From Swiss-Prot:
Residues 1-23 form the signal peptide. It is found in: Membrane. Keywords: Membrane, Signal, Transmembrane, Transmembrane helix. The lineage of its organism: Archaea, Methanobacteriati, Methanobacteriota, Thermococci, Thermococcales. This is Uncharacterized protein PYRAB14350.
């Protein structure tokens, strides 16, 4: 019996028992996310769908008059419990205070970065764990959008990871959720991430590489009303994405400009050395670099010292050599 068949069979058995998954009690009437970055909106979608509550993207610094008018109308209907997704840098304390002054009861769930925010949300809404976990790259918005759709369909949490290695938050989330299978989505994840998960003892299934879509079936029968509700929900998602798209395009261009300016500080040789380290999972023995990039040991030593001064890498003594580790998130391509 092939490994692929066993994985498919396991996923189908998990899907049949998804109704046993217990989410946190529905204590919210509205989810608030920032309107200048799509990632928090995407990781909020599965929980919005799970609890059947809307998401409102807002200015992260302060509430404008139109948003306040919407919120006043909402609270007058008795819906006064708000969940803010993201830390104070994502949605400011000023916005939180404005909401409280309007009479809302505010809860905030956020981490140091988007991977930790995703972990905290997953553990909050699935305190008893989940037999299925969706994993996507924190920097590949397309894959995260697809991952959110799968998480909504299968009623399971979503975690985010770094591209070249499993993020500490995703690792902890997987351990605490203790799933039967971790489903990886998209091409923005390195195979070292999958290997790390498998070495932890979990089955993996890679949508976009193994089978697309996965053969997962649920026992829930969709009624006409459910179908209509689902269509309305996804229409709302589509409209929101259309509204946000000009902002996203602008931010993407600005990000690319900043990235280009950032990369200009590095020489061609420094970029080659950085690429070699990143492709090795973010750290490597210094003695291995000359063979990989083709530069002499003195040249490698000088490059590493320069990268240390720029705060990009750090070195740790290991026997007669050094372990060189990338300490700053950097995207070369």
């Amino acid at each position: 019996m092939s490994r692929s068949f066993m994985i498919i069979l396991t996923i189908m058995l998990i899907a049949l028992s998804l109704g046993e998954v217990l989410a946190a009690e529905n204590g919210y009437d509205l989810i608030i996310v920032r309107n200048d970055d799509l990632i928090d909106y995407l990781i909020a979608l599965p929980y919005s769908h799970l609890l059947d509550i809307p998401i409102l993207p807002v200015n992260p610094k302060e509430l404008d008059d139109v948003t306040k008018a919407q919120l006043y109308s909402y609270i007058q209907l008795g819906r006064d419990k708000i969940l803010i997704i993201g830390n104070n840098n994502a949605v400011s304390l000023n916005v939180e205070k404005e909401l409280e002054d309007m009479g809302f009861k505010v809860t905030r769930i956020g981490g140091a970065d988007r991977t930790e925010t995703a972990e905290k949300l997953a553990l909050h809404f699935y305190p008893n764990g989940s037999k299925l976990v969706i994993l996507a790259s924190a920097w590949d918005y397309g894959s995260t959008l697809a991952a959110s759709e799968f998480a909504m369909e299968y009623k399971c949490p979503i975690l985010l990871t770094w591209e070249n290695q499993l993020s500490p938050s995703a690792l902890e989330g997987i351990k605490k959720l203790n799933p039967k299978i971790v489903i990886l989505v998209g091409f923005g994840i390195n195979e070292t991430v999958e290997k790390t998960i498998e070495d932890m003892g979990y089955e993996t299934y890679w949508i976009g590489r193994d089978i697309e879509p996965p053969p997962i079936e649920t026992t829930t029968t969709t009624t006409p009303n459910q179908t209509s509700s689902s269509k309305s929900f996804f229409l709302g998602v589509l409209v929101t994405l259309m509204i946000l798209s000009p902002v996203i395009v602008y931010l993407w261009k600005k990000r690319e400009e900043r990235r280009s300016q950032f990369l200009e500080q590095f020489s061609e040789k420094e970029i080659e050395v950085l690429r070699a380290i990143i492709e090795n999972g973010g750290e490597i023995k210094q003695e291995e670099l000359p063979k990989i990039v083709g530069y002499s040991r003195p040249t490698i030593s000088r490059i590493i010292q320069d990268l240390e001064k720029k705060g990009i890498v750090e070195r740790e003594k290991s026997g007669k050599t050094f372990i060189v580790r990338v300490i700053k998130k950097i995207k070369l391509d």
